[in-house]
Amino acid sequence: MFVVGQRWISESENNLGLGIVTASDNRTVTIQFPAAEEERIYALSVAPLTRVQFQKGDRINSVEGWQLDVEEVVENQGFIIYLGKRADSGEEAVLPEMQLDHKVSFSKPQDRLFSAQIDRSDRFALRYRALQHQQAQFQSPLRGMRGIRASLIPHQLHIAKEVGQRVAPRVLLADEVGLGKTIEAGMILQQQLFSGRVERVLVLVPESLQHQWLVEMLRRFNLKFSLFDEERCADFDKADEDGNDVSENPFDSEALVIASIDWLESSPNRAKQVLASNWDMLIVDEAHHLEWSENEPSVGYQFVERLSKQTSAVLLLTATPEQLGQESHFARLALLDADRFYDYNSFVAEQKDYKPVADAVATLLNDKPLSNDEQNSIADLLSEKDTEPMFKVINSEKSKENDRLQVRQELIRELIDRHGTSRVLFRNTRQGVKGFPHRVYHQITLEMPSQYTNALKVMGMMGGVTKDDQLYPERLFQRMNPAAKWADFDPRIEWLITFLKNHRDEKILVICKQADTAIALEQILREREAIRSAVFHEKMSIVERDRASAYFAQMEEGAQVLISSSIGSEGRNFQFASNLVLFNLPDNPDLLEQSIGRLDRIGQKNDIQIHVPCFENSMQMILATWYHQGLNAFEETCPMGAALFREFGEELEIFLKNPQAVGFDEFLAKTFKRQQHLKAELEQGRDRLLELNSNGGEAAQALAEAIAKEDNNPHLVNFALSLFDVIGLEQEDLGEQSIVISPTGHMLVPDFPGIAEDGTTVTFDRQLALMREDVEFLTWDHPMIRNGIDLITSGYIGKSAISLLINKNLPAGTLLLEAIYMVETQAPKGLNLTRFLPPTPVRILLDNKGNDMAAQVSFAGLEKQLKPLNKQMANKIAKMAQADIKKLIGISEQKIAAKLPELIEKASQDADSTLSAELHRLTSLQAVNKNIRSDEIEALEQQRIESLKQIALANWRLDSLRVIVSNKE
């Protein structure tokens, strides 16, 4: 059936152009689409492909640009050869199908009309609206940011927009913990995916954060990443009969991959496979663990360095400021731009030069006069500007307040553009971002039960007491006494029950170390005390966790308490609760902050009450006291926690193993003194200029407001409900702004993506979606809406229709033709030309004399006057009026051909204006800021040239048509 070299088109992806068969076997066929620089592999049984065969009388284009008027079609061994005359010279010519223009597009609604494949008029209307919405969404500046299941936080949106719209972004996201670096990275990634600049993404994280990333990417962005570990990769290891390695690269099997950097550091073979796979974007979380020194970079650093050199887009995430390790900070920046950050000493000197400028900015922000030193620092940096008049306005008491404000803002903008690392480094601090609650610590001291004391004593005599045994004695006891139940005597349970009863009207999150502990606790609360509770752990599926989360989120009939394992809660935030019980204490400061971070988020309305029940004179008590009095980690975020843990870890271990040891108070005082010293260093080293650039100011606030206006958009709601109806999905309104969408037996497609067998609950309301993770949040960016639009626009739904127009002013039987043409380019996705010329529907409405009335008669206005026709009558009209319809189609082609140059000109102007402005801005900045990469400017210039070239090649095709016949009644 398929022969290498034959030409086929994709029925589901018309925009790919004309394909060439490059390979075929018993099960699959491979098609190359040169126009779009894409390749597809189809299963033979369900390949959505149509053989391309032109007929006598057709005019066809060659790949060399000349046209042939076909006079004869010859087939030879599966290949087609076209014979005819060249349109330009009239000479006889031969055109084998291999030489056909790759940019041919096929979609002939007239063929369907005349072959009795006539659709309902309301489906034609839905198709046109889908095309209009598709065009609008391609051009929306909010695309890739509005669909996130998260609150609209201005600084996050600012960073996402600033970075997400760059070509090959390479940045360091260094917001303090709790400010949403993962969300920023996700929005940047989403924009890059939507624009087509990125397809294959690798996320490297510490092992403990793998599930958090997996869950956050799915629940917040609808991105289905795959988790790669040794077990998964082992399935790809193969050897032939002779024992030769014929393994496939496992990392080539998925486009979106999450892997543990710890695992890859310890597995050179897997690291080699990662390097052998081609990635478009690399994201590294907890990048401060990549240790570097000039003479001895760590294995992890060297691995990421090699990856970053062969990957165009790189995002590094770290919460550790450079003051805790200037060398490592320099090394992370070098991963992003080795040419710019090539010498550590030069970097240190340059950073020192910016310190006085940052101080001057603080003065500007506080609306105070600038000192002479501050004026000199600013003048040195803005050497090409005459700053003297600006200083006079700022320092003069006679200046109007509004004038001072304008000059201050202009100066700050100029300084931001010249900041040494402001283009590659973004950092927001809690001091700079308002809206965080206080944290209040409550330590509950309980007597350790004799059962635990005895178990620890016996295990100690056997020489096998571990740190985990002492921190979590319930697990040790259960291991030694499988028939008994630790929950029958543990005083923490009685305390928890009493606490819950005293706070019946409050939501409480309880975090345990292990899933088994969480399961046992929840069972006791539910069965013994009839307390409404839910459990949440890593052994549950994501759907089960969503349901538990939704039950906890319900205000009236929901669970009072959610009991979660520490791993189970990763990636979940419950800011509607303000009480946290740490049933088991995390064993390092980072994990402690992660646990508190489940509640301590922007949007938390109340102070967070942190309750820690622990046994007297135990390892738990020592650790809790050190966290509180040494690090102050319960009541404040502690960015230096990990560094202090490393610095004092060995000494802490002495007191953990022997809680009675002398000198603990002195140790606490020493830790706290060091913590205060580092905290002061951090505060002193705060770069106000960098924070200002990272914050986004009023523009970021305006961006958040613009997205908020799109939430619950009535156009989206109406379109989505019509879409679900046409697809054949059942809709049940649940009230409270949610709907259940369920599959039926009469759907257009057997399996619509995103719809579960038992139905899926959806909402258009962001706040409800934040409360209920089991509810899908529908926006224009959601896969359900995007897939629905693709289903309508790329298939045959609504391509041809015939309707009755009830109008007493027109003679009965008057024929009108409504033609929808698409103007589009067939260019590589990476150019992101849809910003300037998306697939654009152009409506032409012809009367029986060929006059275009589209401007006078609106689509919506006409739609109200139309009545449906039964299929038999529609077919009869199509046959009777075939000649007139063909004549009107010919006239409509002349009309669209006349409109095309204007559309191309406007798109070219938009592209040239946008890309030239960005090019000019970067070129100007490069003269005063070394951080502007030359390769970025070169790529942008190349993009501008190629974009204008491809837009000039835009063409039109007839997408759909509706024949309208008038009647008096």
UniProtKB/Swiss-Prot annotation:
UniProt-recorded Gene Ontology molecular function terms: ATP binding; DNA binding; helicase activity; hydrolase activity, acting on acid anhydrides
Annotated residues for binding of ATP: D175, E176, V177, G178, L179, G180, K181, T182
Keywords of this entry: Activator, ATP-binding, DNA-binding, Helicase, Hydrolase, Nucleotide-binding, Transcription, Transcription regulation
Limits of the Helicase C-terminal domain: 492-663
Bridged cysteine pairs (disulfide): none
Domain of life: Bacteria
EC number: 3.6.4.-
Cross-referenced SMART domains: DEXDc (SM00487), HELICc (SM00490)
TM regions (residue ranges): none
Positions of short motif DEAH box: 285-288
Description of how the protein assembles with itself and partners: Interacts with the RNAP. Has a higher affinity for the core RNAP than for the holoenzyme. Its ATPase activity is stimulated by binding to RNAP.
Family: Belongs to the SNF2/RAD54 helicase family. RapA subfamily.
Task performed by this protein: Transcription regulator that activates transcription by stimulating RNA polymerase (RNAP) recycling in case of stress conditions such as supercoiled DNA or high salt concentrations. Probably acts by releasing the RNAP, when it is trapped or immobilized on tightly supercoiled DNA. Does not activate transcription on linear DNA. Probably not involved in DNA repair.
Protein name as catalogued: RNA polymerase-associated protein RapA
Gene label: rapA
